[in-house]
């Protein structure tokens, strides 16, 4: 059984992923297509906040992820890995009440489910480094 927060993260991931192939469409509108009546009010509000936050901070998020890609560029990553990293990096930096371990564990699960056999390990390595060097100090106490 998926928790409401896991379902919310999946909705955000799916919207980010679909936006890669539907660039001319608004990211928030893509999210609305995904959010149906099975999502509760809080999950919808959280998903919308995540999408707005990712959109507003995307250049900084992408720049930060790029710093940890050895011999790779962000554009060369699979759309799955790139968008899992964007979602989780946003959550690590801006969602103060989510423990670092929860963010990374959920990102690994999404990457393993939708990515390649190496996606989970790859995402884990990048996010672990981002968390250690950039997550707010209070997140280490959750």
Swiss-Prot record:
Transcription keyword on record: yes
Keywords carried by this UniProt record: RNA-binding, Transcription, Transcription antitermination, Transcription regulation
SUPFAM superfamilies: NusB-like
Any single biological process term in GO: transcription antitermination
InterPro entries: NusB-like_sf, NusB_fam, NusB_RsmB_TIM44
Superkingdom assignment: Bacteria
GO molecular function: RNA binding
Keyword Cytoplasm in annotation: no
Gene3D superfamilies according to UniProt: NusB-like (1.10.940.10)
Cellular component per GO, a single term: cytosol
NCBIfam families referenced in this protein's UniProt entry, alphabetically: nusB
HAMAP family for the chain: NusB
Protein family per UniProt: Belongs to the NusB family.
Function: Involved in transcription antitermination. Required for transcription of ribosomal RNA (rRNA) genes. Binds specifically to the boxA antiterminator sequence of the ribosomal RNA (rrn) operons.
Name recorded for this polypeptide: Transcription antitermination protein NusB
Provenance organism: Thermotoga petrophila (strain ATCC BAA-488 / DSM 13995 / JCM 10881 / RKU-1)
């Amino acid at each position: 059984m998926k928790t409401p927060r896991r379902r919310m993260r999946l909705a955000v991931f799916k919207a980010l992923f679909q936006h890669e192939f539907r660039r001319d469409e608004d990211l928030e509108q893509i999210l609305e297509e995904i959010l149906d009546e099975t999502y509760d009010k809080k999950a919808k509000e959280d998903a919308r906040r995540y999408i707005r936050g990712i959109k507003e901070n995307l250049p900084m998020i992408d720049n930060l992820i790029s710093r940890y890609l050895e011999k790779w560029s962000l554009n060369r990553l699979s759309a799955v890995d790139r968008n899992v990293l964007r979602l989780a990096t946003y959550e690590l930096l801006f969602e103060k009440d989510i423990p670092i371990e929860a963010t990374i564990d959920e990102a690994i699960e999404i990457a393993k489910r939708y990515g390649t056999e190496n996606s989970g390990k790859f995402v884990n390595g990048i996010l672990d480094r981002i968390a250690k060097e950039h997550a707010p100090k209070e997140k280490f106490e959750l």
